[in-house]
């Protein structure tokens, strides 16, 4: 029997050229952690197989860190999931040209379902859709606007053949209050596609709980603030997740 492994994706969120973490996705709640490349290379050195790289300025529609992200991806030897502001053909193709293994669509999937369905058809498992949730309402545009009912949007994405979902409880993100296990369980009951959890991971115990969902279709977890805050190290987390 294959051992159940939870993939871990340490996050590097970039705003104004710096690696930062937000609390509940609020602009202005940033804590800066220095150069993004230093953070990304540190996670690679610690054994990460993935890095979750986010352009917050693009997500909030206030600019872009494209040149810097290109430099980060070029220096890494691990897989990169790229997120933030990918809303049309130009930004999607640009993200894939950077060398990202996978691209997260957020706002676009809510605001332009026709384009999203076409992107999924064209690029298959290179596309993941980020579902950022408050209760069962989706948040759009850097989490500042409502994006509709989670289950209605999920049904539409299932019909479009979406390959993977990244599910974030916005109320938990950056708070170190633990992941929303109930939301993830509901999501896993409604899709056969792999799901990646994001938001709230605060302890190794949280990762134990998430790993228990792997047999039900949870593929991985994005870990951010807990690593930066020193709640645990990435090697410790990888051990708990079943890697190494």
From Swiss-Prot:
Catalytic class of the enzyme: isomerase
GO aspect biological process, one term: L-tryptophan biosynthetic process
Main location: cytoplasm
GO molecular function terms attached to this record: 1-(5-phosphoribosyl)-5-[(5-phosphoribosylamino)methylideneamino]imidazole-4-carboxamide isomerase activity; phosphoribosylanthranilate isomerase activity
Subcellular location per the Swiss-Prot or TrEMBL entry: Cytoplasm
A Gene Ontology term for the protein's cellular component: cytoplasm
Keyword annotations from UniProtKB, A to Z: Amino-acid biosynthesis, Cytoplasm, Histidine biosynthesis, Isomerase
Location of the active site: 13, 132
Matching Pfam families: His_biosynth
Signal peptide positions on this chain: none
Reaction(s) the record says it catalyses: 1-(5-phospho-beta-D-ribosyl)-5-[(5-phospho-beta-D-ribosylamino)methylideneamino]imidazole-4-carboxamide = 5-[(5-phospho-1-deoxy-D-ribulos-1-ylimino)methylamino]-1-(5-phospho-beta-D-ribosyl)imidazole-4-carboxamide
Pathway stated in the Swiss-Prot or TrEMBL entry: Amino-acid biosynthesis; L-histidine biosynthesis; L-histidine from 5-phospho-alpha-D-ribose 1-diphosphate: step 4/9
Enzyme Commission numbers on file: 5.3.1.16
Family in the record: Belongs to the HisA/HisF family.
UniProt name for this protein: 1-(5-phosphoribosyl)-5-[(5-phosphoribosylamino)methylideneamino] imidazole-4-carboxamide isomerase
Protein's organism: Renibacterium salmoninarum (strain ATCC 33209 / DSM 20767 / JCM 11484 / NBRC 15589 / NCIMB 2235)
Name of the coding gene: hisA
């Amino acid at each position: 029997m294959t051992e159940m492994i939870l993939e871990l994706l340490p996050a590097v969120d970039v705003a104004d050229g710096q690696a930062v973490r937000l609390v509940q996705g609020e602009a202005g709640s940033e804590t800066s952690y220095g150069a993004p490349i230093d953070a990304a290379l540190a996670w690679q050195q610690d054994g990460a197989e993935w890095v979750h790289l986010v352009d917050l300025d693009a997500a909030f529609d206030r600019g872009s860190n494209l040149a810097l992200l290109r430099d980060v991806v070029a220096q890494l030897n691990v897989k990169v999931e790229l997120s933030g502001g990918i809303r049309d053909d130009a930004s999607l193709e640009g993200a894939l040209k950077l060398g990202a293994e996978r691209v997260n669509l957020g706002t676009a999937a809510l605001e332009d379902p026709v384009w999203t369905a076409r992107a999924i058809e064209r690029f298959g498992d290179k596309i993941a859709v980020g579902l950022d949730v408050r209760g069962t309402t989706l948040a759009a545009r850097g989490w500042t606007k409502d994006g509709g009912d989670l289950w209605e949007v999920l049904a539409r994405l299932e019909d479009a053949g979406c390959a993977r979902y990244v599910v974030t409880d916005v109320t938990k993100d950056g708070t170190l209050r633990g992941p929303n296990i109930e939301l993830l369980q509901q999501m896993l009951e409604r899709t056969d596609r792999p799901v990646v959890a994001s938001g709230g991971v605060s302890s190794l115990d949280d990762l134990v709980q998430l790993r228990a969902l792997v047999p039900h279709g949870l593929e991985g977890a994005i870990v951010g603030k807990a690593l930066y805050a020193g709640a645990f190290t990435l090697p410790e987390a990888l051990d708990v997740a079943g890697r190494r």
